[in-house]
Amino acid sequence: MAQWQWQQEHEAKRRIEALVFEHRCELEDDGLDPDEIDRRCAEFRAQLNTTAAPPPAVVDEVSQPLPRLLEQLLSPDDRAAVEQAAVVCRRRYPRLNGEGDVTGSKAHAITYLHRDGYFGRDHGPLLKKITGAMARDWRGPPLTVRCVEHHVYTEGGGLVLEDHRDLGSSLSLSVLLSDQYKGGAFTTTEDGVTTAHVPRVGDGVLFASETVHNVSTIESGERRALVVELWTGPATTHDRSK
C-alpha cells in the first residue's frame, strides 16, 4: 500500500474513533447503562464505517492561506445577539450546555446555539453572514453547519488538550466576544510551529478544522467566544454528532 493511501485510511479511522468517543461521552451524560453504551457505540461506529467519506477538503491555501483573520466580522449588535442567544439556549436546553463535549469543564462552559435549529431560525441573517464569510473561498463540496457554540472560559479554564482538532469538520471559526481577561491566548500549530493569534473583539480566526488549536489557561477574568464549524455532513440539530 502506498504511503499516501495508508495515511488517508489512518486519518479516516482516527476521525471515526474521535466521533465515537464524543458519542460515548454524550451517552454517559445521559446516564445509560455501560452495556447499552457499548452497544450503541458499536452501532454508531458501524454506521460511520458504512458512510465514511473522503477526508474533508479545505480552501486552496495557496491563494487563500489559512489560518487567517476576519477583521470585525461581528458588529456590536451581532455580538449582543449572540450573547442573547446563549442566554436563551441555556434556559431552553439546560441538558445541552456542552456536557457532551470532552473539552468542557466547570471553568469552560459550552452552549450549543444550533440545538433544534434555533440559531439558524431565530438569527438566520447573522448565521448566513458568518457562514458566507467562512466559505467565501471554498472550493470543495457543499458545506453545512455542524455546530454553533458559545464558549465561556473563566479562571483556570482553557483548551489545552494536546493535538486538539475539530475532527470531521472542514472549516472552523473562533470569534472573540470579550477581552476582559488575562491568559487565554488562541494558538494554532502546523508542522510543529505554533502561532499565537491576537484578535480584537469582533474579529474571527478562520482555520482548517484539522489544524491543531488551543486556548491557554485563563489567569483572571472571563474569555467569551463564538465557535462555528462547517462540514460536508448533514446539518446537526442536537450537538456536534447528530
Model-derived features with residue positions:
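Generic preference for well-ordered alpha-helical elements
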Residues: 13, 17-20, 34, 38-41, ...
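Catalytic core of non-heme Fe(II) oxygenases with the double-stranded beta-helix
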Residues: 128-242
